[in-house]
Amino acid sequence: MIELLSIALKHSNIILNSIFIGAFILNLLFAFTIIFMERRSANSIWAWLLVLVFLPLFGFILYLLLGRQIQRDQIFKIDKEDKKGLELIVDEQLAALKNENFSNSNYQIVKFKEMIQMLLYNNAAFLTTDNDLKIYTDGQEKFDDLIQDIRNATDYIHFQYYIIQNDELGRTILNELGKKAEQGVEVKILYDDMGSRGLRKKGLRPFRNKGGHAEAFFPSKLPLINLRMNNRNHRKIVVIDGQIGYVGGFNVGDEYLGKSKKFGYWRDTHLRIVGDAVNALQLRFILDWNSQATRDHISYDDRYFPDVNSGGTIGVQIASSGPDEEWEQIKYGYLKMISSAKKSIYIQSPYFIPDQAFLDSIKIAALGGVDVNIMIPNKPDHPFVFWATLKNAASLLDAGVKVFHYDNGFLHSKTLVIDDEIASVGTANMDHRSFTLNFEVNAFIYDQQIAKKLKQAFIDDLAVSSELTKARYAKRSLWIKFKEGISQLLSPIL
């Protein structure tokens, strides 16, 4: 008996040793990949090395799920002829910027031509100058208008969201889209497989049975694990008949109407656009759809890019970014805006975990006399992200930055307003995930009236916010300091 136990222990030791050796070899291979084969910041490299060293049995699994970088092999493809047409528009606009020769040009477009040129050159974010915009800060108003626009559609509806919940609002929207599909309108839904995991096939069955088409972005090929869970499509885009576009922070679900007991009122920012900027949203949707669709690819014909008579005069660039891009375009757009500030900066972001260079740009602006105001949530939806956000925002207090906690529910708005002149609204948070890992889209707006309206929305929010002063921050408990420290350490991989 003792001899049998001895043999069993010996074999179990051999198995355990084999597991540890195998994990060590895998971690070593992944460490080599992280250091030499991938483009990462030094902070990200060190964070992943710490994970591999201190979690030897699970580090490589975490890396497979959360750390792998996507291959930059043109996920989003456009045929040669259409690419030539897009390049022609970009070249013409670059020449016009150089000569300051823009039709309907306004003061902001001339003043910020370097920023426009940067987004044009590296992101093909062509400038449109004939737009009319409506700003939403309340979910009920936004979805009321969206449903009405869906009901008025006559040709097609292209509908893309990170999250579509299988709840009352989600089913209402899907039902309205299904009705249009039954009427012969082309209706296509693109949803993120991770963000909309509550929807999946069963929730879409009635919509599909009515003739609608739906595709998941980066769907999982395994039942419980998505190996691309780290690269999600966070974009929210709607295009209706090529005439109306929506972009911003609201997802689709009851909680975005303020019906969540956990979060309460949901404060976000979204845009309704009429004008040629809708063509840019359409292009982004087609690229995303065609990259995932197994059938029903969308062509680039004139039907999807009609002339729009908006009567508007607002300048807009639609910029997108993602792990497939060489440059972090939305981040660069934010940085260019911040560096151009002379009077004021207003930032709203639920997740504020930028890199040190980004934080330094804000400090430089504040130390140079710019009035810098940042608003973040006062309740967490992701604990580690919340504590890292708090620590980053508080690190700016000594430079004179004013930081506010939004107390009236949950703040999910992603806005940046500079000097009452230009603004950005979209899906990108001010963190590593939005800048580098996720697929995002933002509208960069060159218009004083829109900038002033967005600034006023921030000021209105101050009535239900509390300032995070240095004295108040200094009183936080040791437990909060500990959570901040751990979250800050993990921030490069959050």
Swiss-Prot record:
A single Gene Ontology biological process assigned to it is: cardiolipin biosynthetic process
What EC number(s) is this enzyme filed under?
A: 2.7.8.-
Q: Which UniProt keywords apply?
A: Cell membrane, Lipid biosynthesis, Lipid metabolism, Membrane, Phospholipid biosynthesis, Phospholipid metabolism, Repeat, Transferase, Transmembrane, Transmembrane helix
One Pfam match: PLDc_2
Alphabetized SUPFAM superfamilies for the sequence: Phospholipase D/nuclease
**Active site positions, chain numbering:** 234, 236, 241, 412, 414, 419
- What does the record give under GO molecular function? cardiolipin synthase activity
| Record GO cellular component, one term | plasma membrane
Q: Which InterPro entries match?
A: Cardiolipin_synth_Firmi, Cardiolipin_synthase, CLS_N, PLD-like_dom, PLipase_D/transphosphatidylase
Topology relative to the lipid bilayer, per the entry, is: Multi-pass membrane protein
Which segments cross the bilayer?
14-34, 45-65
The top EC class is transferase
Record's SMART domains? PLDc
Task: Tell me the domain of life.
Answer: Bacteria
Please write the reaction equations for the catalytic activity of this protein. Answer: 2 a 1,2-diacyl-sn-glycero-3-phospho-(1'-sn-glycerol) = a cardiolipin + glycerol
Location comes to:
Cell membrane
* Stretches assigned to the PLD phosphodiesterase domain: 229-256, 407-434
Q: Which PROSITE patterns match?
A: PLD (PS50035)
Q: Which family does it belong to?
A: Belongs to the phospholipase D family. Cardiolipin synthase subfamily.
Q: What NCBIfam families does the annotation carry?
A: bac_cardiolipin (TIGR04265)
Described by its record, this protein's role is as follows: Catalyzes the reversible phosphatidyl group transfer from one phosphatidylglycerol molecule to another to form cardiolipin (CL) (diphosphatidylglycerol) and glycerol.
Instruction: Provide the protein name.
Output: Cardiolipin synthase
Species this protein is from: Staphylococcus aureus (strain Mu50 / ATCC 700699)
Q: What's the name of its gene? A: cls
